[in-house]
């Protein structure tokens, strides 16, 4: 699968379009421990494998798996580390999609999804050039999560990868990637923040975001884009 390429889609489709509804499908309980959530570590997955399998129950008609980007980014990162996991769904009253704190001096915010990592730190990256400069500074093979706000309303989180010096904007929620120039034309640049993730350890709170692939039996599987 290493040679396969992700489909490139128009920015704005991830993060839910606000038209989804809550399903009547019973949710599967969260794993009790981080070890249970991650399962056994295997061979790191390619970008293609990680992204295409991160959120297999995606369905734009329902909120659970079309507004769970805060979990899909964790699943995508975990898969690139070698864990065969998928994203858990969001749910009514879920706090993970929310902003936890905004520094009044710097304007840099902290999001609840960051709790899946130990020592996660967001940096303001208001332009495509600033994101790519940071990623190149981190080095080949580095990975991060980009938090954005769409100009049309709503927010989103996606993964960023430095592969051979080329920066890729990948979206495990919908199983696709974005053109960087198009992406930045659709987002509020002042609200864009980058968190490096490849050098961080998972915290116990990551168990709220991922589950071993195939452990969910009460959901209809929907193939991503």
Task: Give, region by region, the residue ranges found by the protein language model.
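Short coil/turn linker and secondary-structure boundary residues
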Residues: 29, 45, 108, 123-126, ...
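Active-site or metal-binding loop neighborhoods of secreted/extracellular toxin and effector enzymes
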Residues: 121, 129-225
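Compact soluble domain cores
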Residues: 70-138
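Sequence-level detector for tyrosine residue identity
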Residues: 48, 57-58, 62, 83, ...
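Generic secondary-structure transition motif, activating predominantly at the C-termini of alpha-helices
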Residues: 38, 42, 55-58, 117, ...
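Low-complexity, glycine/serine/proline-rich disordered segments
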Residues: 1-80, 95-97, 196-225
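Tryptophan-centered short beta-strand motifs
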Residues: 5, 22, 120-122, 167
């Amino acid at each position: 699968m290493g040679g396969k390429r992700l489909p490139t889609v128009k920015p704005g489709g991830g993060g839910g379009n606000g038209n989804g509804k809550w399903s009547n499908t019973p949710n599967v309980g969260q794993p009790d421990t981080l070890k249970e959530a991650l399962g056994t570590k295997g061979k790191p997955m390619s970008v293609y494998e990680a992204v295409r399998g991160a959120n297999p129950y995606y369905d734009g008609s329902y909120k659970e798996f079309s507004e769970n980007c805060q979990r899909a980014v964790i699943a995508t990162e975990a898969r690139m580390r070698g864990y065969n996991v998928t994203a858990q769904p969001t749910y009514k009253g879920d706090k993970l999609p929310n902003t936890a704190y905004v520094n009044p001096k710097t304007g840099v915010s902290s999001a609840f999804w960051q709790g899946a990592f130990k020592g996660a730190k967001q940096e303001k990256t208001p332009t495509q050039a600033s994101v790519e400069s940071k990623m190149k500074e981190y080095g080949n093979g580095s990975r991060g999560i980009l938090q954005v706000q769409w100009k049309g309303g709503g927010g989103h989180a996606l993964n960023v990868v430095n592969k051979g010096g080329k920066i890729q904007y990948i979206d495990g929620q919908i199983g696709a990637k974005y053109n960087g120039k198009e992406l930045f034309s659709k987002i509020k640049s002042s609200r864009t923040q980058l968190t490096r993730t490849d050098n961080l350890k998972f915290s116990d709170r990551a168990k709220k975001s991922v589950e071993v692939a195939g452990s969910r039996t009460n959901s209809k599987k929907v193939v991503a884009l």
